[in-house]
From Swiss-Prot:
<keyword id="KW-0539">Nucleus</keyword>
<dbReference type="GO" id="GO:0032040">
    <property type="term" value="C:small-subunit processome"/>
</dbReference>
<dbReference type="Pfam" id="PF13339">
    <property type="entry name" value="AATF-Che1"/>
</dbReference>
<protein>
    <recommendedName>
        <fullName>Protein BFR2</fullName>
    </recommendedName>
</protein>
<dbReference type="Pfam" id="PF08164">
    <property type="entry name" value="TRAUB"/>
</dbReference>
<feature type="region of interest" description="Disordered">
    <location>
        <begin position="372"/>
        <end position="401"/>
    </location>
</feature>
<dbReference type="InterPro" id="IPR025160">
    <property type="entry name" value="AATF"/>
</dbReference>
<dbReference type="GO" id="GO:0000462">
    <property type="term" value="P:maturation of SSU-rRNA from tricistronic rRNA transcript (SSU-rRNA, 5.8S rRNA, LSU-rRNA)"/>
</dbReference>
<feature type="region of interest" description="Disordered">
    <location>
        <begin position="14"/>
        <end position="158"/>
    </location>
</feature>
<dbReference type="InterPro" id="IPR012617">
    <property type="entry name" value="AATF_C"/>
</dbReference>
<comment type="similarity">
    <text>Belongs to the AATF family.</text>
</comment>
<feature type="compositionally biased region" description="Acidic residues">
    <location>
        <begin position="132"/>
        <end position="146"/>
    </location>
</feature>
<dbReference type="InterPro" id="IPR039223">
    <property type="entry name" value="AATF/Bfr2"/>
</dbReference>
<dbReference type="GO" id="GO:0005730">
    <property type="term" value="C:nucleolus"/>
</dbReference>
Length: 528
């Protein structure tokens, strides 16, 4: 069926500018693509370069040529025959064969003109020159290939060396980082152990506080002991002495082992535990251990104090360098222990007013020589600023109490309070840090939960109110226990209004009688 006029018109109207080709038709694409493509490419390049400005040769090209023409880029001169003997020999054999052939031809054809010979020689020379030029090109190409391969190998070797250096530096950095992390972890663990040891020592001191206070009440002289000692007390005293002897031996053994292990002692001490050693021998051994520990302690404190001061930068300021707080820890300890009599005197203050058993009797009998000598010395000495004559921390009026010095008691309550305050502050700080973390975690969890919103309290369906907190330090007036009567209330308000009310009962009864008589004598009668 043929196309209608409308179809033909629409086909002509919608005909595309670029003709459509069937990709399966092989004859459509059979044309000279090279010629047309080259011409089209030339035209395109000409159009693209039409707006270019004509410029001269670049200076970079001249510099590049100068660099390339440098003497270091030129090769060494040599003869081809020396390098390529094999190729020369092959060329010689071929020329011999050709010469023999030409001789045979001359014998057979003697009448040939000399022009043919000259033409053949020229042809042979041209062929040889072509072969020589080809050999030279191949030689130069092989030399360039070898140079390129050598350069590539050098670049690969340098790249491998750089990668090895980078890998080695990375390993060293990781090793240093791991070592630093391990050192920091060890320092933190050591600090935690020191804190635990400090807390344990203060805990022991807290438990011994009651024992020290009770020990100050024990009798001071032998006569007082014998007068108050019975069989049961003697048995308890003997068991306590054995226990104290055992504890002192264990402490001496532990300290000796520790100081030998840590190389604190200059000469290793051979400790042999024995039950026959007296308390005096154990005390002497502890004194020797203390003397050897003192030097080691000073060196360690000085080393770590210097490191801490160097990292904090306090030593850089010349104005604060010589302050007591900025000096090394061992120097501060030595300065505190320099005035030992003053420190001992502070431990002999009777702060709690302790009176040992039999103290009055011993004092009257003059069995306390230390107390008598101290009282005589105090009479001629001036008042000490650290140990006032009238001192009692429990009393507000210290001038009324004479808390004198007693050399037979031991009371380090001031130092004990300092240690206890440090421990309490540390515990409070740790608790606050933990509570802050818990509060942050709780607030974060509350933010994730759904808000508590009453959806039914809109449009006046609920009355919103808040309970007011009670007023602090306020008390409403309280009645004295009696109330006004009705007559008093009426009289009070009547007086406020300027009226007077009479509360006489007889007058009210007479008024009632008069009213009744007036009703009886009334002329109006309704019922008979």
């Amino acid at each position: 069926m043929g196309k209608t006029l409308a179809d033909q018109i629409t086909e002509l109207a919608n005909k595309s500018k670029v003709p459509d080709f069937d990709i399966e038709d092989e004859q459509v694409f059979e044309h000279d693509s090279n010629a047309s493509g080259s011409e089209a490419s030339d035209e395109d390049e000409a159009l693209q370069a039409a707006h270019y400005v004509q410029v001269g040769r670049s200076k970079l090209r001249n510099k590049h040529n100068v660099l390339v023409e440098d003497s270091k880029y030129s090769g060494s001169k040599g003869s081809r025959e020396a390098l390529f003997n094999s190729s020369g020999e092959e060329d010689g054999s071929e020329s011999d064969r050709r010469g023999s052939d030409s001789d045979g031809g001359s014998d057979s054809d003697s009448d040939a003109p000399e022009a043919t010979l000259s033409s053949e020689q020229s042809a042979d020379e041209s062929a040889r020159s072509d072969s020589d030029s080809g050999d030279s090109d191949s030689d130069s190409g092989s030399d360039a290939g070898e140079e390129n391969s050598a350069v590539a190998e050098d670049a690969d070797a340098k790249r491998e060396r750089l990668s090895q250096l980078v890998r080695l530096e990375t390993q060293q950095a990781m090793g240093k980082l791991n070592a630093a992390v391990q050192n920091d972890a060890l320092k933190g663990y050591a600090i935690m152990e020191q804190s635990r040891f400090f807390e344990g020592a203060i805990d022991v001191r807290i438990k011994l506080q009651k024992a020290i206070a009770a020990a100050n009440q024990l009798p001071l002289t032998k006569q007082s002991w014998e007068s108050r000692l019975d069989a049961q007390d003697a048995e308890l005293l003997e068991s306590t002495c054995k226990l104290l002897h055992k504890v002192a031996g264990k402490c001496a053994e532990l300290r000796t082992t520790f100081q030998n292990k840590e190389r604190i002692n200059q000469t290793e001490i051979d400790y042999q535990p024995s039950k026959k050693r007296s308390i005096d021998a154990l005390a002497e051994q502890c004194h020797d251990l203390d003397s050897q520990l003192r030097d080691y302690r000073g060196a360690v404190l000085h080393m770590w104090s210097s490191k801490v001061a160097a990292t904090s930068g306090k030593t850089a300021l010349s104005s604060s360098k010589f302050k007591a707080i900025n000096q090394p820890a061992n120097v501060q300890v030595d300065n505190q222990l320099a005035d030992m009599p003053r420190l001992v005197k502070r431990t002999q203050l009777n702060r709690r007013g302790v009176v040992p058993l039999g103290f009055e009797e011993d004092y009257k009998q003059k069995r306390l020589p230390l107390l008598d000598s101290n009282s005589a010395q105090d009479g001629g000495q001036e008042e000490d600023a650290d140990v006032p004559a009238n001192y009692d921390p429990r009393k507000k009026d210290n001038n009324a109490i004479d808390a004198s010095e007693n050399p037979y008691i031991f009371d380090d309550e001031d130092f004990y309070r300092v240690l206890l305050n440090d421990l309490v502050d540390k515990k409070i700080l740790n608790a606050q840090q933990g509570s802050n973390v818990q509060v942050a975690i709780k607030a974060r969890s509350q933010n994730k939960l759904k808000k508590n919103v009453d959806t039914k309290a809109s449009k006046g369906r609920k009355l919103n109110y808040s309970v007011q907190e009670p007023i602090a330090n306020y008390e409403a007036p309280i009645n004295g226990g009696f109330k006004w009567s009705d007559e008093q209330i009426d009289e009070f308000f009547a007086g406020l209004l300027g009226q007077r009310v009479n509360f006489d009962e007889r007058e009210t009864s007479e008024a009632k009688d008069n009213e009744e008589e007036a009703i009886e004598h009334d002329d109006l009668r309704i019922f008979g």
